[in-house]
Amino acid sequence: VIARVIAAAGDDGKLERARELGADEVINYTNENIGDAARALTGGRGVDACLEMIGGDILIQSVDALASGARMASIGAHGGEKIELDFVEFFRKHISVHGCGRSTKAQVERVLALMAEGKLKPVIHKTFGLDEAAAAHEVMESRNFFGRMVLTR
């Protein structure tokens, strides 16, 4: 086994989709604390790597889920929330958290090449015309989607 994938989401429908896409375990963060649940799923150890995409309290819970020596990449905090983190945990557990923003041109080219080779398949919730941009934004604000929304001409 190369990796055991644990996915977290706020509703069971999204968790079911995550299982369909290959998640081995799922955590509903509406009902469970991510750190507690991740440790329960890993025999108390925590996770070695985490991709966090929401920010706020979910980021804090994700840091709590990390094992000693783990790494986390965060592309969350889109709402601009300010949070408090206990940096003693970072030192004690030797963890690192990387903030991720825009992709570089080289990264985009690599992703496009993987897609062209059929090795990476994007999950698309819905495609909208440019004249439907407001409707696409409403769907995003509702958080009632799984995958990406695509705008086309």
PLM features: residue spans?
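CheY-like receiver
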Residues: 37, 41, 65, 114, ...
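Glycine-rich phosphate-binding loop and adjacent beta-alpha segment
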Residues: 12, 53-123, 153
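Residue-level recognition of specific faces of alpha-helices
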Residues: 17, 71-74, 148
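Short, hinge-like loop/turn segments at secondary-structure boundaries
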Residues: 23-27, 45, 89-92, 114-117, ...
